[in-house]
């Protein structure tokens, strides 16, 4: 060997790391790296080798890049080459940051092609994921065309290798598979300084350690290595780097009284060391007192600490063993159970499958979902109720269907009874419970006596027939000997066909002043009724004006023979047809429709239509 070669070996600088969210700590990492580079310039080393994790992130900020280039330019100014490999923290898919610096003439990326420094060749292997280590290809390593006499070979890696802790690659295996003998392996990724001999040839393997503390557990001094190669062999020496102080304080609480005084007393014992330090306070002892961590941290900051961290070890000490145990469930089983609990329909299951499928890329989720749902819709017959998901409604109470109520004290809600007047209340929509018992639903009514029309004892009532969305009031003639409920039941069970009224054209009744038009004549079963198209705007007792109007109406309609409907032309009937409006009563209480049956269409069990979701 013609002359002695000195190479500075460093690694794990983690530039750009804002430790504890502190801008000062970010600057500390750059200062440590700057110290290393300045030492290389001052010692006039032959080269600087960086063994990975130059940056803490694969996406450093522009400010981080500019500061790094300014520091590396110091080496370029004195013709000291900077060699590096890619670590796991900064690794990108294609072009690496080292490639950018190489284009700028600030660095050179190591690989299977050697870099020559004097009579020393340097190779590099970028960080390899653990899963790809068994597949690593050792072929392709080249030797210089003409090897210098007594040429030394160095290999740079960013990997934790055996026999070091947490190793995932056998260092001896690497040495055996290389096509040449290596004099030393310069390593990165392990933040602690280490130096041992490995393999049958007893090759040196060394970690330089990180240049700054990345965690509180890294309590040893930070350093870098100087590799000296000469005719006498290879020598590895360590140089430490001055870094910010990490101060650890322990406070033990004895008894329940004055815990803060005991803690502050322990802190005050280190007042000279606290300024500009990163301070960690561990609290132990009696756990009965409750402490405010923020108050303690503020006290440390008031004493000059750069960063203050408080750890309460008492919590861990008081936890019972069974509480401290952690159990993990199968994630696939948990997801399947949650999907089952959600009761998704076919469309929901399709969307869930697409979103969680690893075979569908994110950019194609919307397109794939739309296509699958369209195919599902094409296979569905929306007129066939079989594709619906039926949820049985709650059983109907007998009191909901046959108990008459007073129009004053017990107003009828449109959600409480069946609209026998509406076409929606046909036999096709009767509750299955009623069909099974061979009974027809009997509507709840509100009724009040109007007058006796003839000596035969027929009395006319105004019956409020409560439907799904509207309320009608209709005069119904019954005999005195029959109760209103029996009359309504008889009328409802009669044939559906309505007998035609004789050709009598009664004069239309005079309009009533405080009345509101809400509907047209309708039929209630076979009981031919005249449904008054006018009802009072407000509930309550009938006024004399209303009684006179009703009496006059009945006298006019009494000319009809038997039970008949109000006669008129088709045009007049069509003109009177309009959607009835529900006249709510002040005392009416809302009732959930899902709690009752026998209400027209709502008598069918509640259904969820897939079309509603699509």
UniProtKB/Swiss-Prot annotation:
Source organism phylogeny: Archaea, Methanobacteriati, Methanobacteriota, Stenosarchaea group, Methanomicrobia
Activity modulation comment: Nuclease activity is regulated by Rad50.
Low complexity bias (residue ranges): 411-425
EC number from the UniProt entry: 3.1.-.-
Co-factor remark: Binds 2 manganese ions per subunit.
Function: Part of the Rad50/Mre11 complex, which is involved in the early steps of DNA double-strand break (DSB) repair. The complex may facilitate opening of the processed DNA ends to aid in the recruitment of HerA and NurA. Mre11 binds to DSB ends and has both double-stranded 3'-5' exonuclease activity and single-stranded endonuclease activity.
Binding positions (Mn(2+) 1): 12, 14, 53, 191
Binding of Mn(2+) 2, residues: 53, 88, 158, 189
Enzyme class: hydrolase
Keywords tagged on the record: DNA damage, DNA repair, Endonuclease, Exonuclease, Hydrolase, Manganese, Metal-binding, Nuclease
UniProt-annotated stretches for the region Disordered: 393-434, 487-614
Active site, per annotation: 89 (proton donor)
Quaternary structure (record): Homodimer. Forms a heterotetramer composed of two Mre11 subunits and two Rad50 subunits.
UniProt xrefs under Gene3D superfamilies: 3.60.21.10
Required cofactor names: Mn(2+)
GO BP term, example: DNA repair
Domain of life: Archaea
A molecular function GO annotation: DNA exonuclease activity
Organism the protein comes from: Methanosarcina acetivorans (strain ATCC 35395 / DSM 2834 / JCM 12185 / C2A)
Family, similarity comment: Belongs to the MRE11/RAD32 family.
Protein name listed in UniProt: DNA double-strand break repair protein Mre11
UniProt feature, compositional bias: Basic and acidic residues: 487-502, 535-558, 568-591
